[in-house]
Amino acid sequence: MNKNVMVKGLTALTILTILTSLGFAENISNQPHSIAKAEKNVKEITDATKEPYNSVVAFVGGTGVVVGKNTIVTNKHIAKSNDIFKNRVSAHHSSKGKGGGNYDVKDIVEYPGKEDLAIVHVHETSTEGLNFNKNVSYTKFADGAKVKDRISVIGYPKGAQTKYKMFESTGTINHISGTFMEFDAYAQPGNSGSPVLNSKHELIGILYAGSGKDESEKNFGVYFTPQLKEFIQNNIEK
């Protein structure tokens, strides 16, 4: 991998910080991470109980998005790294709003191709006794996207360091080729798996990496082609 390309999840090479309020553990990266040349239109989402924010979940070191019954889409490297600590996700946690509960992971289905895409199924009842599907919304798929479309990225950058505050950034699609897309919405470690949404809050894809010398100048996502959408839809719990 190019040394200037970094995935947006937090690595497992650092000190483990226990976040009892979320019910799972988080590792904090020692490496410097920030983004310079990406468009920096960022706002904190303090109340994540409404759409599209209540479809976003926090993983250990990353983010995911709910697409159906007990079903979350994220990156392979986030789904795998979650096994290192605890198999648990937190539904739309935010600094002021009511969270949707903490849910244990049931199983993981990785996309068989090269794309950094995985499906995570969770148990329906949270550790607090909440029902997953009554506390989240399901994000709809976009029909497609094109260069210069405006987008938003929602997730948990620097999760433990920000006490899992949710942030939304906006930007523009710069390039699409096959299942690859490049855009300039601001992102940081912890944004891996974050949904990339169009202006209608429909799901275009998920973020997986960024590129830059000291700071990320570009961000990359898995673009949901019809083939990828079919894979996801076939793995939504019935």
Curated annotation (Swiss-Prot):
Enzyme group, top EC level?
Answer: hydrolase
The answer to keyword Protease applying to this record is yes
A single Pfam family it belongs to is: Trypsin
Q: Which residues form the active site?
A: H77, D116, S192
Key words, A-Z: Hydrolase, Protease, Secreted, Serine protease, Signal
Asked if the keyword Membrane belongs to this entry, the reply reads: no
In the Enzyme Commission scheme, what number(s) does this protein have? 3.4.21.-
Which Gene3D superfamilies does this UniProt record tie to the protein? Trypsin-like serine proteases
Induction and repression of expression: Negatively regulated by sigma-B factor.
Tell me, what is one Gene Ontology molecular-function annotation carried by this entry? serine-type endopeptidase activity
GO biological process terms on file: proteolysis
Subcellular location(s) of the protein: Secreted
- Matching PROSITE patterns: V8_HIS (PS00672)
* Gene Ontology terms: cellular component: extracellular region
This protein is called Serine protease SplA
Q: Which residues form a coiled coil?
A: none
Task: Give the signal peptide as a residue range, or say none if absent.
Answer: 1-38
Please report which protein family the annotation says this sequence is part of: Belongs to the peptidase S1B family.
